[in-house]
């Protein structure tokens, strides 16, 4: 039996203005644009191999915190983003992680896959080094972590982040697989022949 396509829900969280939406847009649209802050929640789906990623982006603003429970529910991965030019945004990741765990009621937070992105590495005013960020995350967040230095502006490691998720998910059993018989090929040409009985 052929395996179906897996749907993986990925939420992207962190303080406002750390580049969450720019990361998402760089990956999905393959371009960088300076954006206004996200209002509420943004959602896109992209396919990688036999995995479809549902990417959920939120504003990072306090007034939208009531949306988080429905936004977080059913997440398979959580991407925590901070700005390498603003040390406080790194320290706030623990609060974001703890809030995510509390609202999703994850059974085993140590095993849940968190991906940490140190964004804006293109900025010459970087204050958080990769080594310092990794060590801080190990000491304060712990668990199943993967770290990437990224730049949405210069397209550094953006593709690699989502390829990593896709590759990790390809061989894992998933309860939300789409059976192959329900997949529709958009590239297959149908025959124009008709038959009569």
Swiss-Prot record:
InterPro entries: P-loop_NTPase, Small_GTP-bd, Small_GTPase. One of its GO terms (biological process) is protein transport. A lipid is attached at residues 196-197 (S-geranylgeranyl cysteine). A motif (Effector region) lies at residues 31-39. Keywords: GTP-binding, Lipoprotein, Nucleotide-binding, Prenylation, Protein transport, Transport. It comes from the Eukaryota. One of its GO terms (molecular function) is GTPase activity. SMART domains: ARF, RAB, RAN, RAS, RHO. Protein transport. Probably involved in vesicular traffic. Belongs to the small GTPase superfamily. Rab family. This is Ras-related protein Rab-7B. It comes from Dictyostelium discoideum. The gene is rab7B.
């Amino acid at each position: 039996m052929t395996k179906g396509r897996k749907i993986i829900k990925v939420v992207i969280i962190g303080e406002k203005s750390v580049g969450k939406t720019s990361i998402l847009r760089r990956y999905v649209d393959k371009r960088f644009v300076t954006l206004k802050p996200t209002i509420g929640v943004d959602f896109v789906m992209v396919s990688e191999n036999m995995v479809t990623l549902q990417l959920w982006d939120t504003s990072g603003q306090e007034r939208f915190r009531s949306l988080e429970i429905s936004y977080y529910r059913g997440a398979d991965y959580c991407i925590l983003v901070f700005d390498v030019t603003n040390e406080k945004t790194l320290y706030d990741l623990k609060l974001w992680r703890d809030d995510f765990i509390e609202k999703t009621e994850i059974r085993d937070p140590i095993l849940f896959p968190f991906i940490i992105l140190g964004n804006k590495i293109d900025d010459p005013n970087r204050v958080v080094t990769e080594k310092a960020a990794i060590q801080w995350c190990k000491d304060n967040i712990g668990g199943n972590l993967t770290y990437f230095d990224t730049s949405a502006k210069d397209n550094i490691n953006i593709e690699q982040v989502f390829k990593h998720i896709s590759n990790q998910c390809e061989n894992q059993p998933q309860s939300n697989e789409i059976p192959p018989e329900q997949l529709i090929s958009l590239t297959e040409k149908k025959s124009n022949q008709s038959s009569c009985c």
